[in-house]
């Protein structure tokens, strides 16, 4: 763990304790001063002072890193200093005051509340915002309001190039100089009704706006954003067979160990136990019966203590109420705005500060971005990754296996003890679980059947045990690539597996 990460998590956990008492007594939480009033400013902490509850008040002295004051739920955060990117991002309610300069994408994806910056801001302020108000007393960088859907941005200084590019709603009011708007925006003069509306916010701050201010709004003639291609799996593992090696089959009375224990790297205790190597999507508290009740799930809300909580833009703010109950978190990069490594780490620090120390922390993305995904897992020192086998336009699950394997080998994930899970779009069979395990993915992530989950879990457990006896292995971790065969030339070509009958990989894979 980096020093700044440790400092940030400690600050968040200390704040949780202070907020409890402060809310009861209606007190202001002061951070950055000693008991005697001497200044001890913070410096560079990331993902801190997030998820502030309603009526909370925090004053902090210092300069902060990424995602400061993000996911605000109704509190007031005053920063006596500056900050880097994504300050106030995903804010729902409340108020953020920054007394110096702020970095890129301040207020990104916010949907309510106000952000007041007494200095200047860098590029893409208010990008993709859906509501609320951002006031910048100084200047704003390039592409202010990029992709915004609603809300208001007021810049009392000048703005950089391409203001309002890609905007689909809302308005940007610029009191200083403004270059031609970007694609998707058009410019006009400010109206009297708008001046009156904005003055209600500016006058209490001792500010005003002139009649020559410019307003950027959506260009109704701009082209549409475009529809995202649908991601799917057009073929599963049908072209792959599971075969025994040289071992004899096991007797019917032989004890078996089909359990899979997922541990954080370097740990030997705790972890998450899977009776079947299957992480069930979106079941959670509805499980009933002895089999399904002990099987971990991947849920977006109401997790049990054996469930992983999937976090994306939809539940990023509200997930804070469920974090203490879950066995770990999975940050879904495929359904979050594009962020750099430091911003992703800021979100993870914010979330992981509120979970148990033993909880797992993982990332999820599609297989076509697996190299980037694994690099993040290693550089941010996370516990593993979920790789979605689907692709835009339709992909083959078998084709995902070599991509995952080669990327994992390049990053040395197996030797580091990091866990890999592959996501399919249909309830898994025993063969699917064994094939995934043999290819290096400990767990299959897949939806539950439409009916009777308990019976399905019992059938899957029984079938896996039968396969283990036939393969001659008493522990599911013993299966590997030697137990897998490509059933046809096409599958052998895309997977690098041994072609059944030929009993070796195709020549194009030799040396790889």
Regions found by a protein language model. Give the residues of each.
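Long, distal/terminal scaffolding or interaction modules
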Residues: 1-243
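N-terminal capping/small domains of soluble enzymes
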Residues: 2-57, 206-327, 463, 467, ...
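Gly/Ser/Thr/Ala-enriched C-terminal appendages of enzymes
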Residues: 143, 150, 158-233, 410-415, ...
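Structural signal for hydrophobic packing residues in well-ordered secondary-structure cores
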Residues: 19, 23, 64, 83, ...
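Structural motif
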Residues: 56-58, 76-77, 95-96, 114-115, ...
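Conserved active-site and cofactor/substrate-binding residues in soluble primary-metabolism enzymes
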Residues: 14, 53, 67, 72, ...
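Alpha/beta enzyme core
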Residues: 63, 82, 101, 294-449, ...
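Catalytic cores of large soluble enzymes that bind and process phosphate-bearing ligands
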Residues: 7, 11, 186, 190, ...
């Amino acid at each position: 763990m980096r020093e700044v990460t440790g400092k940030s998590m400690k600050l968040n956990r200390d704040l949780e304790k202070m907020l409890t008492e402060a809310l009861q007594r209606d007190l202001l939480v002061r951070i950055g001063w000693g008991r005697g009033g001497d200044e001890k400013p913070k410096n560079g902490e990331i993902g801190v002072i997030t998820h502030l509850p309603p009526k909370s008040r925090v004053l902090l002295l210092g300069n902060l890193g990424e995602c400061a004051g993000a996911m605000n739920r109704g509190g007031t955060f005053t920063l006596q200093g500056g900050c880097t990117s994504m300050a106030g991002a995903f804010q729902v309610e409340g108020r953020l005051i920054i007394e110096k300069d702020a970095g890129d994408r301040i207020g990104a994806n916010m949907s309510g509340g106000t952000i007041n910056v007494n200095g200047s801001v860098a590029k893409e302020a208010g990008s993709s915002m859906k509501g609320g108000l951002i006031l910048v007393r100084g200047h704003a960088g390039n592409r202010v309001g990029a992709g915004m859907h609603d809300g208001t941005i007021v810049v009392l200084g000048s703005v950089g190039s391409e203001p309002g590019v890609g905007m689909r709603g809302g308005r940007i009011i610029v009191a200083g100089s403004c270059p031609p708007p970007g694609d998707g925006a058009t410019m006009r003069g400010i109206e009297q009704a708008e001046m009156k509306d904005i003055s209600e916010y500016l006058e209490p701050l001792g500010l005003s706006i002139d009649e020559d201010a410019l307003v950027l709004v959506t260009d109704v003639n701009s082209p549409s954003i475009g529809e995202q291609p649908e991601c799917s799996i057009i073929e599963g593992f049908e072209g792959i067979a599971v075969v025994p090696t040289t071992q004899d089959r096991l007797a019917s009375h032989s004890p078996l160990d089909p359990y899979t224990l997922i541990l954080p790297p370097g740990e030997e205790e705790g972890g998450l136990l899977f009776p079947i190597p299957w992480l069930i999507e979106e079941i959670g508290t509805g499980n009933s019966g002895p089999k399904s009740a002990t099987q971990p799930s991947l849920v977006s809300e109401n997790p049990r203590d054996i469930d992983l909580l999937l976090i994306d833009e939809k539940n990023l703010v509200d997930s804070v109420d469920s974090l203490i109950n879950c066995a770990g978190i999975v940050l879904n990069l495929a359904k979050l705005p594009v962020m750099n490594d430091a911003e992703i780490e800021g979100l993870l620090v914010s979330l992981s500060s509120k979970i148990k120390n033993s909880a797992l922390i993982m990332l999820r993305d599609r297989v076509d971005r697996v190299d980037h995904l694994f690099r993040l897992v290693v550089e941010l020192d996370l516990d593993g990754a979920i790789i979605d086998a689907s692709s835009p336009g339709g992909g083959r699950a078998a084709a995902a296996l070599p991509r995952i394997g080669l990327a994992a080998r390049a990053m040395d994930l197996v030797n580091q003890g990091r866990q890999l899970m592959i996501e399919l779009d249909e309830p898994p069979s025993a063969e699917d679980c064994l094939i995934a395990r043999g290819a290096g993915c400990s767990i299959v992530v897949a939806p539950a059947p439409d009916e009777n989950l308990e019976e399905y879990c019992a059938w899957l457990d029984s079938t896996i045990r039968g396969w283990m006896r036939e393969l001659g292995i008493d522990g599911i971790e013993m299966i590997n690539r030697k137990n897998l065969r490509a059933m046809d030339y096409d599958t052998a070509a895309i997977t690098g597996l041994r072609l059944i009958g030929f009993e070796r990989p195709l020549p194009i894979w030799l040396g790889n």
